[in-house]
Regions:
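C-terminal interaction modules
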Residues: 1-8, 14-20, 40-44, 91-95, ...
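N-terminal domain-start segments of secreted/luminal proteins
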Residues: 18-56, 60-65, 69-72, 85-91, ...
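His/acidic/aromatic-lined binding-pocket segments of jelly-roll/cupin-type domains
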Residues: 23-25, 54-56, 72, 97-98, ...
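A short, compositionally biased
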Residues: 26-30, 57-60, 115-116, 155-164, ...
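Flexible glycine-/small-residue-rich
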Residues: 27, 76, 100, 133, ...
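Short, small-residue-rich packing micro-motifs
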Residues: 55-64, 73-122, 163-165
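Tight coil/turn sites that cap or link beta-strands
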Residues: 69, 76-79, 125-126, 133-134, ...
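Long, low-complexity intrinsically disordered regions
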Residues: 114-136
Length: 235
């Protein structure tokens, strides 16, 4: 009886962040779902997200807004796993671990990356990305090969900048700090390719930026042109 009471007390003291809602589906078009343990939960705008969830799309797209202002955009036939999310600014605690395991996922930094960047791990099957408060997109193929591209970041006032990321495997690391600079990784045992600037036509820039122009990321067409101009200045 005393042992049972001890177990119950220990369970009551488990961090609530393990089961708390850490964000929600802010936009969805077409079919998508949330894998939660052994359950598959149909998703839509307003669906709550928990740590250890996996967001999956088939012929749809999804955007998730986290409570620390981190945002991820997930395109068709993609999967994003939320391995860990802890955000407690009152106690100066924050950590985030995500894995893009298939398809195309765009990541935009929130408060955790800005305040606790050492506690942020963004992964693909073949690479780990170190984040220093910026946006980037990951494209992951069926065997885990990954293309990581750094993107310009713009606020709702139209102010744009390019941050910096590191892309690392067991065999090496590269640093990227120019908009539309990209590197590829085939396996975790091979080094990333040297970063190169992508020479992109206008429609491909639109695709890589994953159409945030209809969300608060960029308010109007003029601000949208500013964002693309920053990228094209480097290509």
């Amino acid at each position: 009886m005393q042992f049972a009471r001890y177990i119950l007390t220990a369970l009551l003291w488990l961090p609530i962040t393990a089961y708390a809602n850490i964000g929600q589906v802010a936009d969805q078009k077409g079919n998508g779902a949330i894998e939660r343990g052994r359950d598959l939960v149909g998703s839509g705008v307003g669906t709550e997200i928990q740590s250890m969830d996996a967001a999956v799309t088939t012929n749809g797209t999804m955007r998730i807004d986290f409570i620390d202002d981190t945002r991820v955009d997930i395109t068709q036939h993609s999967k994003l796993i939320i391995d860990e999310f802890v955000f407690d600014p009152a106690n100066d605690i924050g950590s985030l671990s995500l894995k893009a395991s298939l398809g195309t996922v765009r990541y935009a930094s929130g408060q955790i990356a800005k305040k606790y960047k050492q506690n942020v791990k963004i992964r693909t099957p073949s690479a780990t990305i170190g984040v220093r408060g910026t946006d980037f997109v990951m494209v992951v193929d069926e065997v885990g090969g990954s293309l990581i591209t750094l993107l310009p970041s713009c606020d709702s006032a139209g102010n744009c900048y390019t941050g910096e990321i590191t892309v690392e495997t067991d065999a090496g690391m590269v640093i990227m700090n120019q908009a539309f600079q990209a590197t590829a990784t085939q396996t975790s045992s091979q080094p990333p390719t040297p970063p190169r600037l992508l020479d992109l036509p206008e429609d491909m820039i639109d695709a890589l930026l994953i159409v945030r122009k209809k969300t608060p990321w960029v308010e109007d067409e003029e601000e949208w042109k500013k964002a693309k101009k920053i990228g094209r200045a480097h290509v």
